[in-house]
Amino acid sequence: MGVLSALRDLLAEPSLAGLDPDGPEFTAAHRAIVERKELVRLVFADFCRRCREADERLFADCAARARIELGSGAGLMRQLYPEVITSDVKPLPFVDVLARGEELPFRDGSLRAVYGINVFHHLADTEAFFHELTRAVAPGGGCVLIEPHYGPAARLLFRHLFTSEDYDVHAPSWQRHDRDRPASDANQALSYVVLRRDGARWQERFPGLRLLADTPHTHLSYLVSGGVNFRQLVPTSAGRGIRRLERALAPLDPILALQHTIVIRRER
């Protein structure tokens, strides 16, 4: 894989060089990249929109109104939906509260929705997260998670190109056993491992939760934008055409998609 290693080095976003991926400076650099690169902003804005649309469509009967985004970091949720409480595990000037998915700082049944954009695979204890969903989210509410997909293109790229974090569909465990390990020590295939490979086991352990949707999406638009870790590959002016092409290729999303949106509702 020497060629891929050289390609990663060539395409790497230079503003991240030398930064600790678990430090606040890294998050601040990511935020600056999102603000600077319009194509990345459009991708992240689409992720936020997907969270909100799933919430409004599938949690409509929930009596609670409060919504929280986990791992808000460099994201756009606060700008697009200012009523959503933003949070992170690091003290950052642009989030509302410090919060971990395993320890939500809210009363029982007080939340309508929990959003997480590429956050779930960083959790140290996924079972604690689902227990917290069952406790803090009111019946009829739930969570919307956007995570790395598990189709052929995603497996290829996350295993061989986007390698800053592991991607292991055969991982024996759902969690890292030491909560003090860095969040970057993650398994990007975790949503597949827990909800697909071990889906029957997950449902048995959490009978009050129901997986409502698992929708693959996003490939070309993310790749050409470079995301937050790589250089942009096309002029910004090409973005509209790229998005049109991506929509035309939607029937191939199960094969090409790099992300998927997961919706889980608390039934009781």
Predicted stretch roles:
Residues 127-139:
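A short glycine-rich, Lys/Arg-flanked "PGG" loop and its adjoining helix->strand segment in the class I
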Residues 1-40, 46-50:
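N-terminal, positively charged/glycine-rich alpha-helical extensions of SAM-dependent methyltransferases
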Residues 215-265:
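Conserved Class I S-adenosyl-L-methionine
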Residues 43-66:
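Conserved alpha-helix/loop element of class I SAM-dependent methyltransferases that forms part
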Residues 143-178:
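Conserved class I S-adenosyl-L-methionine
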Residues 189-214:
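Short alpha-helix
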